[in-house]
Amino acid sequence: MRITQVFLSVNDNSVYTEFVEPVVAQWHRVIPGVRVTLLWCDHRLPPHSWESIPGLDDVHVVVNVPDLVNIPTAITALWARYFFASLISAPGDVSIISDVDMFPLSRDYFVHQLEAVPSDTYAHLHANVPAYGRIPSCYHVASAANFRAVLGLEKGSWTESMLKVWASRKHADGWFCDEDFATCQMQASRHTFYMPSRRHQFDRIDRDLYYDVEMLSLGAYYDLHAPRPYHEHAAKIQSILQAVPGETRPALGHDILAYRVL
């Protein structure tokens, strides 16, 4: 299995939109040749300037039809990644969904560990976080057919799908409803999943931007969950990205491939 397409999404919120260009660039550094599709979920059109962002292959405008008028665009942006990963693909594509403020750091994590995983597998690279209480949106990895089969998206339109997810919400504002719905669908599925355990609890750089210099030089961190807004932290974020090794494999290694049915 090799990731060929990345799905990101935003609404018209500068706190998130300013991440688009640097995050797209970082995905191309980690997975050379990957296609990046940005889902724009808002009542307004996306900025024309995005047409010239290097490496941004497609800006897909998700039309918020009248039936969805009472659902915040931030929530439609969350679920859009799952739905359109099941719809927009070329033959042989394997897609990953991610947050627009997540910077991938490790080629070992996003490329090499998947090399032995069959392409018909549904993978999740960050599922083993019991305290979180649900399977995070980052990082589902699958073909379009498997996104449809596992998440129950074989039938129905974008509108029907979004209304179903919104109806299942556990919080009034709808936050986490995409993850809660996807978690229930995965638990009900009899599909085979690849869900590796985290190597240790300090294998990512979080919003406080704390990291160990030696671990960074070894390639031991797999992603950076960036603080917002980007412009206030850009220098520190870019210094971290520039210090990440290229093909260096981390000395920590991976757990045995974890194939299982939820």
Placement of each model-derived feature along the sequence:
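GT-A fold catalytic core of metal-dependent nucleotide-sugar glycosyltransferases
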Residues: 77-125
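Catalytic core and acceptor-binding pocket of nucleotide-sugar-dependent glycosyltransferases
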Residues: 145-260
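Short His-Asn-centered micro-motif
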Residues: 8-12, 38-42, 75, 97-100, ...
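N-terminal anchoring/stem segment of glycosyltransferases
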Residues: 1-69, 255, 259-261
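A short, glycine-/small-residue-rich helix N-cap motif at loop->alpha-helix starts
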Residues: 16, 69-80
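Short, solvent-exposed loop/turn segments at secondary-structure junctions
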Residues: 12-14, 43-45, 68, 102-104, ...
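Conserved catalytic core of nucleotide-sugar-dependent glycosyltransferases
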Residues: 105-179
